[in-house]
Amino acid sequence: MKDGSIMVIGIAGGTGSGKTTLTEMLTERYGAKAYYEQSDNPYIGDFYNDMNRWSFNLQMYFLGSRIQQTMDILRSGPVDIFQDRTVYEDAYIFADNLHRMGLMSGRDFDTYMSIFGLITNLVPRPDLLIYLKASVPTLISQIRRRGRAYEMNIDEQYLRRLNDRYDDWIENIYRGEVLVIDKDREDFVADAAVMEKICARLDRKREELETAKK
């Protein structure tokens, strides 16, 4: 189990919201350890070409990799952790959205959520979740800028649906502590004040954890 004074921070947000960039910046600043979303999922290219056929395979692979990350975090040494996307997003955003769109069958979705529930009942939530909230135009701009081939044909309506799921999850489902960064107005790369805002919240969280441990 992790030391009680060590921060585990989840960084959440849609495709192109800047999760990986923020994870890198915070990891360097805090001398922390980063856990990144696996971009080499062997199903991801097939999924973007045929979502109905490959949705369950894609999500189960991500869930498996997230389970491994969680186990690694629980066994980690005395170092802060920043996690690029959380297991909760896999379920409440992506799997749920695919099911709502008719791209994942009810049977597959129920199987997925059953496994997800077993796992999340055994592991703690992040100490703080940083949600990078971004409009679809902002996401598309970022996606095009980074130029990943398998993302070039991503559907705008699909991104819009994901944003709706994110908003519902943050407002109505997630029970942990959340810091929302509005990526349309708050650029933590270009504006140092935004990064200082994030770090000030993290520093307060550290103080809370250290006080609770005493």
Q: Which residues does each PLM region occupy?
A:
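P-loop (Walker A) phosphate-binding loop of NTP-binding proteins
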Residues: G14
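ATP-binding Walker
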Residues: S17
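Conserved substrate/cofactor phosphate-moiety recognition/catalytic segment
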Residues: E28-S65
